[in-house]
From Swiss-Prot:
Protein name as catalogued: Coagulation factor XIII A chain
Gene it is expressed from: F13a1
Domain of life: Eukaryota
A GO biological-process term: blood coagulation
Bilayer-spanning residue ranges: none
Enzymatic reactions: L-glutaminyl-[protein] + L-lysyl-[protein] = [protein]-L-lysyl-N(6)-5-L-glutamyl-[protein] + NH4(+)
Modified residues (N-acetylserine): 2
GO cellular component entries: cytoplasm; extracellular region
Main localisation: cytoplasm
Annotated PROSITE patterns: TRANSGLUTAMINASES (PS00547)
Cofactor note: Binds 1 Ca(2+) ion per subunit.
Modification comment: The activation peptide is released by thrombin.
Species of the source: Rattus norvegicus (Rat)
Cofactor(s) recorded in Swiss-Prot or TrEMBL: Ca(2+)
Keyword presence, Cell division: no
Length: 732
């Protein structure tokens, strides 16, 4: 133990940290100056009898502030925009002699200079960017106010009071939970740091509570639906709890840079008891496999109720939950998938693949890993801490990969800064650059201890970067927002800029992008279905008038989606003779029995093919990952697809394998249609079908979606979805 005494503040009169939205101390109902004379009753002065917040879903406050989708009976408004309240008094309000104001308080130690105590004066005209309240109706004993909040206001849940002045001091309404008011970021307000000027983008990146996340491999792109559910009951409070759990000072909660950085640390539980425990080892004891989750709602509600991390998540689950957190608070956000994503252990913009002298991959020496895909988030905001031009989309990553300022977090990193090589600007831009723009270097490890660079592939990493398209389920290619095309002058300048600002590059790969060879090699993998045999075809093209003999080596591996190999299940060496200007093909049969017993949950197989031309000693190298085609869950509905009407949902799954599936779980949910549910089946025999029925009553109209998943001991990553159009209930 350290002998250094703990720091104390007793003699300084310091105010303790104000870092909990949930904590609070009620303001006094009477704040009097001196004694009240005998015979004087304070009730004779102006007194508040009721406060009306117009907080129902159909009221103008929620409609105009785009918060009517929240399943929450409190007033929810967005900062920098006016909203309406009505105050009823014990007598008519006379502005010539009566004085009152509205007060908003957040946290336990409210201070006006910290933005945690907000006195809102009644003014004749509202001023842009400032708190104020204007009387727009004064009839009988009621006053209606147009209240304007600051576009820099703290985001959170405020307690509301009305204070009235008397000759003897202030009378204040009692604390009433019914008048609590949530204030969120406002992408519709030009003065807000998260302002987004395109309405379709706002509808997608703030208001859409259903999304799609892309996974699989560049050569075999898959997508799955994800229920963000940011408007579901309890989710807003759960997101505020995440910041409380981080002990984030309330005064910083109006800054989207700080909020998103705290969120990137708190969505993972690596070092701060955050939301999700990450697990990449295919063992999920005492928890739920990452592939079983169908959305964020269950995860956040469980975290809020238990106040302990939820087990388990991987990158797409973390990104889905982080997206819910950001959209719920009002920060425009989207999930990004980077195919062939580099995890560069030594941050040198270089992924080293070591080969043995016979051309096989040395898994012992190869430490860097190329993830088949990696998901992170982008959040939209201005960056006043950076030079002009680096605002807009910021990369934020909650997957715990590397330590940043003492915690596992990443970002916000300006996507524009990453593209142009300005990696000196905070936060974590060098790491993001490495993920999307490293070189893949093949190195032969000689027996004498020397290393020989055989080939450099400058296009493999960051092969494709995508997100869900606006207004649909398709894919939008955003690769060019992160990097210039390989070979362009701008790409070379961006890399030089990154090196100038401190990015490392162990090997000068300029001019080494492709080994000079008269022979081209490629290979294709036919459509591979889980539990079936398939073929790999390697093609050699001789572009010269020379005769060549080639020694080739194929390695098939069961891999985690992170690129880490679990088991080499197939090896095959073969020789090829290439006549001048000829083409030769070699087929390798992959039998189901060779891979099924080792298979991991995402059904990923990774193939390396290396070949050495005996006459020139040139080494050719290619790698490719495939995703086995996995059966889907089927969802059907019957009944009336109308708000408030019973609808029966049926989930079906047929086991296509020759083995019995054990410990089967089906998960089902749909924001606005049904709460998350799950059901267990002890086993499903080969070719057998299980059915599960649930009755629900939709409460949100319009386009909705049901998501389902199936997980078992030996088969996972099985999904299904169903689009619905829910009608409004006719008005009587």
């Amino acid at each position: 133990m350290s002998d250094t005494p703990a720091t104390t503040f007793g003699g300084r009169g310091a105010i303790p940290p104000n870092n909990s939205n949930a904590a609070g101390v009620d303001l006094p109902t009477e704040d009097l100056q001196g004694l009240v004379p005998r015979g004087v009753s304070l009730k004779d002065y102006l007194n508040v009898t009721a406060v009306h917040l117009f907080k129902e879903r159909w009221d103008s406050n929620k409609i105009v502030h785009h918060t009517d989708k929240f399943d929450n009976n409190k007033l929810i408004v967005r900062r920098g925009q006016t909203f309406y309240i009505q105050i009823d008094f014990n007598r008519p309000y006379d502005p010539r002699k009566d004085l009152f104001r509205v007060e908003y308080v957040i946290g336990r130690y409210p201070q006006e200079n910290k933005g945690t105590y907000i006195p809102v004066p009644v003014v004749t005209e509202l001023q842009s960017g400032k708190w104020g309240a204007k009387v727009i109706m004064n009839e009988d004993r009621s006053v209606r106010l147009s209240v304007q909040s600051s576009p820099e206001c703290i985001v959170g849940k405020f307690r509301m009071y009305v204070a009235v002045w008397t000759p003897y001091g202030i009378l204040r309404t009692q604390r009433d939970p019914e008048t609590d008011t949530y204030i969120l970021f406002n992408p519709w307000c030009e003065e807000d740091a998260v302002y987004l000027d395109d309405e379709k983008e706002r509808e997608e990146y703030v208001l859409n509570d259903i999304g799609g996340i892309f996974h699989g491999d560049f050569n075999d792109i898959k997508s799955r639906s994800w229920s963000y559910g940011q408007f579901e009951d309890g989710i807003l409070d759960a997101c505020l709890f995440v910041m409380d759990k981080a002990e984030m000072d309330l005064s910083g909660r109006g800054n989207p840079i700080k909020v998103s950085r705290v969120g990137s640390a708190m969505v993972n539980a690596k070092d701060d008891e955050g939301v999700l425990v990450g697990s990449w080892d295919n063992v999920y004891a005492y928890g739920i496999p990452p592939s079983a989750w169908t959305g964020s709602v269950d995860i956040l509600l469980e975290y809020r109720s238990s106040e302990t991390p939820v087990r388990y998540g991987q990158c797409w689950v973390l990104a889905g939950v982080f997206n819910t957190f950001l959209r719920c608070l009002g920060i425009p956000a989207r999930v990004i998938t980077n195919y062939s994503s580099a995890h560069d252990n030594d941050a040198n913009l270089q992924m080293d693949i070591f080969l043995e002298e016979d051309g096989s991959v040395s898994f012992k020496l190869t430490k860097d890993s190329v993830w088949n895909y990696h998901c992170w988030n982008e959040a939209w905001m201005t960056r006043p801490d950076l030079p002009v031009g680096f605002g807009g989309w910021q990369a934020v990553d909650s997957t715990p990969q590397e330590n940043s300022d003492g915690m596992y977090r990443c970002g916000p990193a300006s996507v524009q800064a990453v593209k142009h090589g300005h990696v000196c600007f905070q936060f974590d831009a060098p790491f993001v650059l490495g993920e999307v723009n490293s070189d893949l270097v093949y190195i032969t490890a000689k027996k004498d201890g020397t290393h020989v660079v055989e080939n450099v592939d400058a296009t493999h990493i960051g092969k494709l970067i995508v997100t869900k398209e606006i207004g649909g389920d398709g894919m939008q290619d955003i690769t060019d927002t992160y990097k210039f095309q390989e070979g362009q002058e701008e790409e070379r300048l961006a890399l030089e800029t990154a090196l100038m600002y401190g990015a490392k590059k162990t090997l000068n790969t300029e001019g080494m992008v492709k080994s000079s060879s008269d022979v081209d090699m490629n290979f294709d993998v036919e459509n591979a279905v889980l539990g079936k045999d398939f073929r790999v075809t390697i093609t050699f093209q001789n572009n010269s008038s020379n005769l060549y003999t080639i020694l080739a080596y194929l390695s098939g591996n069961i891999t985690f989606y992170t690129g880490v190999s679990k088991k080499e299940f197939k090896t095959e060496s073969f020789e090829v003779t290439l006549d001048p200007l000829s083409l030769e093909k070699k087929e390798v049969l992959i039998r189901a029995g060779e891979y099924m017993s080792y298979l991991l949950e995402q059904g990923l197989l990774h193939f390396f093919v290396t070949a050495r031309i005996n006459e020139t000693r040139v080494v050719l190298a290619k790698q490719k990952a495939i995703v086995l085609t996995i059966p889907k869950v089927t969802i059907k509905v019957r009944g009336t697809a109308m708000v408030g009407s019973d609808m029966v949902v049926t989930v079906e799954f047929t086991n296509p394998l020759k083995e019995t599936l054990k410990n089967v779980w089906l998960h089902l949910e749909g924001p606005g249609v049904m709460r998350p549910k799950r059901k267990m089946f002890r086993e499903i025999r080969p070719n057998a079908t299980v059915q599960w029925e649930e009755v629900c009553q939709p409460w949100v109209s319009g386009h909705r979606k049901l998501n389902a998943s199936m997980t078992s001991d030996s088969l996972r990553h099985v999904y299904g979805e169903l689009d619905l159009q829910i009608r409004r209930r006719p008005t009587v």
